[in-house]
Design a protein with these regions (language model features):
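Active-site-adjacent bridging/hinge elements
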Residues: 7-19, 68-76, 115-117
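A glycine-rich phosphate-binding loop feature that marks nucleotide/adenosyl-phosphate handling sites
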Residues: 16-21, 55-67, 118-122, 156-160
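Short, flexible loop/turn elements at secondary-structure junctions
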Residues: 21, 26-31, 62-64, 109-111, ...
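Glycine- and acidic
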Residues: 18-34, 78-88, 124, 193
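Acidic/histidine-rich catalytic neighborhood
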Residues: 28, 49, 53-93, 99
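Basic, amphipathic alpha-helical recognition segments used for DNA target recognition
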Residues: 1-24, 31-46
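Short, well-ordered alpha-helical packing segments
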Residues: 22, 26, 37-44, 48, ...
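Terminal accessory regions of large proteins
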Residues: 89, 99-102, 106, 110-303
């Protein structure tokens, strides 16, 4: 509450609060403490519910945009309504707590109960952020970290169980190339499109890909916008979320982007790098050589 914030600022001007700082807070008796406790529990519950909607939560179950509707747009509309309702209720609760404690401590002339939107504990829906998190969840399904058939984490080490992935099979060799063209059938873009089709249906695939591409803010055909996001921005966004402990590892040939691939750290095997070299790097080099020869033949024929 505002009261606690003001008192803690006096007791400890830094941003760190110790148990001894909390112990120093003056506590005045209030006749209806259960009312305050219920409000506080309600606030905590809503905050946790919002936090659990993101994959960094230990209690994450599934992405909020995966539901019974057939378009990502409708799923986002439902999610936005849920977020707006939760935001409004939590803001009202926090303002009520402020009002009660301001009255208890007799601080009506110093503080007001109103809470600015930016200070409310939970967040509102954000189209680009939430679509990017949907893409991140899809990548998790590609690697088997998540499954469309299992709540929460499907695999984070231990014994691999292929039976957890009947609806959308996880990548077999834990190597997914990120390509600027359709060099491999199971590249990141191709697998993502298949994932969207599996989740939302083939009838709405084009509509969903366009909605996702528009949310990413790119220009051009939806497939190419999504491909460019995987090429240029996905891994940077992943590292922002997981900071210095990314769960997907990027193998990159250098600045020219000749070859890139992701693996899932928990599925790393002693032969992963060797397999990547023989099954993917050599294959892509061969495709590049073929493309170069084709261009040289065209130039020769035109001269």
């Amino acid at each position: 509450t505002k009261v606690v914030t003001e008192i803690l600022a006096l007791l400890s001007p830094t941003i760190n609060y110790t148990p001894s700082d909390i112990k120093k807070l003056p506590w005045l008796i209030y006749s209806n403490e259960e009312y305050l406790a219920e409000l506080a529990r309600n606030c905590i519950g809503m905050s946790k519910s919002e936090w659990d909607s993101f994959e960094t939560s230990w209690d994450f179950i599934k992405h909020p945009l995966i539901c019974t509707v057939r378009t990502v747009a409708d799923a986002f509309t439902q999610w936005k309504t849920e977020c707006d309702d939760r935001f409004a209720q939590l803001k009202a609760n926090e303002e009520e707590l402020n009002r009660v404690f301001i009255d208890i401590y007799g601080l009506q002339d110093e503080l007001t109960p109103e809470v600015e939107d930016r200070d409310v504990t939970v967040r509102k829906a954000d189209l680009q952020r939430d679509v990017k998190s949907l893409i991140s969840y899809a990548v998790g399904c590609m690697f088997g970290r998540y499954s469309l058939d299992v709540d929460g984490l499907a695999y984070a080490g231990g014994e691999w169980d292929v039976s957890k992935y009947p609806t959308y099979p996880a990548d077999k060799d834990n190597i997914i190339p990120i390509c600027d063209d359709d060099y491999f059938e199971d590249d990141m873009t191709g697998r993502f499109i298949k994932w969207v089709e599996t989740v939302y249906g083939s009838e709405t695939l084009k509509e969903n890909l366009k909605f996702i591409a528009d949310a990413l803010g790119g220009k051009g055909q939806p497939k190419e916008v999504i491909r460019k996001y995987f090429m240029d921005d996905f891994y940077a966004d992943h590292c922002k979320i997981y900071q210095k402990r990314p769960i997907y590892w990027l193998f990159d040939s250098g600045k020219k982007g000749g070859f890139r691939a992701l693996i899932y750290m928990h599925r790393y095997q002693p032969d992963t790098i060797a397999r990547m070299r023989t099954d993917y790097v050599h294959e892509q080099q061969s495709r590049y050589r073929t493309a170069i020869e084709d261009l040289e033949n065209r130039i020769a024929a035109a001269s």
